[in-house]
Regions:
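Mature, Sec-exported extracytoplasmic domains of Gram-positive
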Residues: 1-122
Length: 122
């Protein structure tokens, strides 16, 4: 499905801003010596706290991770059940310290999902 250029640019700019907010945490984190970077659950939780303060839904890829600001996602899904249009962005912090921006859009009939994944280059 083609993505509108405005939506695409908005997602890219949003991800750049989020990655810049996480940069200091990522740079200080112990990433090990392997070529496959893995940050600790503590680092992922620290990154989650930064986004939590922005009042957006955010989850980490750690097992049994809780979604911060889950009520925002619940509200969006409840409205979709009522056939009310809307959208929401969920962020997922991955083991490599990268961030996924998952945008869900409900148009009253269909649900669309746009995903953009960012990661740091060593």
């Amino acid at each position: 499905m083609p993505v509108d250029e405005v939506v695409k640019e908005e997602a890219i700019e949003d991800c750049k801003n989020v990655m810049n907010q996480m940069k200091v945490i990522y740079q200080k984190a112990d990433k090990g010596t392997s070529s496959n970077i893995v940050v600790s659950e503590t680092v992922m939780e620290e990154m989650q706290e930064v986004l939590k303060e922005k009042n957006v839904p955010v989850i980490t890829s750690a097992p049994y991770s809780n979604m911060a600001n889950y009520s925002k996602m619940e509200e969006f899904l409840f409205r979709a059940e009522q056939d009310l249009t809307g959208d929401i962005v969920l962020y997922r912090i991955n083991r490599d310290g990268g961030i996924e921006r998952l945008k869900f859009n409900y148009d009253g009939t269909d649900m669309f999902h746009y995903c953009l994944r960012n990661y740091y280059i060593r």
